[in-house]
Curated annotation (Swiss-Prot):
UniProt name for this protein: Trans-enoyl reductase poxP
Pathway: Secondary metabolite biosynthesis
EC number per UniProt: 1.-.-.-
Induction comment from the UniProt entry of this chain: Expression is positively regulated by the oxaleimides biosynthesis cluster-specific transcription factor poxB.
Natural source organism: Penicillium oxalicum
Gene for this chain: poxP
Length: 378
């Protein structure tokens, strides 16, 4: 990778420390394979961004899926991070007057980005959107902050409100006769976050998971939990909801999940929102409206992927997402939102590569993998 001197753009508040000219990152090689580089330049933040020193990162399925499906040689990998603010852009200072150099923050960015190669959280330094950052209260660790990240909340804003069209929010929850909402994949980090937001928004969240994760999912807010491996899973959900189920969020999105989710609807149908490309051959019910969402689109920037994952730039979506992050900040500050359980993996950047292999093999359940890239600030 080429080396270039590090210098912040004009108008940025001075960095809290002297910045190196190079950093260690994990980026895609010529074949898309995740590879450690020790000579990568620091990212150059835009005026609405802040520069963050990365302390810890969490690993998501998309961190191995995107390089595999959409190789982008040179693109840095990783989405979620927690760290310390080093410098603040002039526009960022205007829109986030609460941010200060030295603040502990967490957020998410578009890793494996073919049109913005330096964007990736598996780096010692990250340029992040100021309005999509959360400040970490003292009671939360950097590991918990990395699990909070930002990609989960970006995904859930689009899934629950832009796609499913839910009206109740944590700021204005439903008051009367709350309807059920199914979260398929309730023990994932996105699942437990969705359940908490739904409960705080006045809905009746129900979920699927493995039985050994029932307590975790109930604690997140599910009023009823169903075993997705049961042959009667869909029928049990339909019976429990008395045919009232109209909203389904499928976090897993495979053939099994799609079949079960579709069968939970009554003849009236409803809206099925998923996070991966669904199988068209299973979309046999006209009364069920399906939509795949891409959480990365919350940035408002173009998503230059393919096969249905591409999105045009949408500044209005970015503005609405930023408002939702303000709501999440309040919930975190008030202790009303609990981060997903963490599992710390040692080894720094080598540990991140190990975590990618763990996720590929399906070696996690009910926990989020976290790696510290800076052990001086645990």
């Amino acid at each position: 990778m080429p080396v270039q001197p590090c210098s912040l753009p004009a108008g940025f508040l001075p960095a809290a420390v002297s910045l190196p000219s190079q950093q260690t990152v994990i980026a895609e090689d010529e074949t898309g394979k995740a590879t450690i580089y020790h000579d990568a330049p620091l990212p150059i933040p835009e005026p609405h961004m802040v520069l963050v020193k990365t302390i810890a990162v969490s690993i998501n399925p998309c961190d191995w899926k995107m390089p595999s499906r959409f190789p982008a040689p040179g693109a840095r990998i990783g989405c979620d991070f927690a760290g310390i603010v080093l410098s603040i852009g002039p526009e960022a200072a205007r829109i986030r007057r609460d941010l200060r150099i030295g603040d502990r923050v967490c957020g998410g960015i578009h890793g494996s980005n073919p049109i913005d190669l330096p964007s990736g959280s598996f780096s010692q330094y990250v340029a992040a959107h100021a309005d999509l950052l959360l400040k970490l209260p003292n009671k939360l660790s950097f590991a918990q902050g990395a699990v909070l990240g930002g990609s989960v909340f970006a995904t859930l804003w689009i899934a629950l409100y832009e796609s499913l069209g839910l009206e109740g929010t944590p700021d204005m929850p439903l008051q009367d006769d709350p309807p059920p909402v199914l979260v398929y994949g309730g023990s994932t980090s996105t699942g437990t976050a969705a359940l908490q937001i739904l409960r705080l928004s006045g809905y009746r969240p129900i979920a699927t998971c493995s039985p050994h994760n029932n307590d975790l999912v109930r604690a997140a807010g599910a009023e009823k939990v169903f075993d997705y491996r049961s042959e009667t899973c869909a029928a049990d959900i339909k019976s429990y909801t008395n045919g009232r189920l109209r909203h389904v969020l499928d976090i897993i999105t495979d053939l099994q999940s799609q079949l079960i989710c579709y069968d939970t609807f009554s003849r009236v149908g409803g809206k099925y929102t998923c996070l991966e490309q669904p199988a068209e051959e299973l979309h046999l019910r006209r009364t069920v409206r399906k939509e795949m969402i891409v959480g990365l689109a919350a940035s408002g920037k173009e998503i230059a992927l393919a096969d249905g994952y591409e999105r045009t730039a949408n500044p209005q979506l970015r503005a609405r997402s930023g408002e939702f992050f303000q709501t999440i900040q309040r919930l975190v500050d008030e202790g009303k939102f609990v981060p997903h359980p963490t599992r710390t993996v040692e080894g720094g950047f080598e540990g991140i590569l190990k975590c990618l292999d763990i996720l590929k093999s399906g070696g996690t359940s009910g926990e989020k993998l976290v790696v510290f890239v800076d052990r001086e600030n645990p």
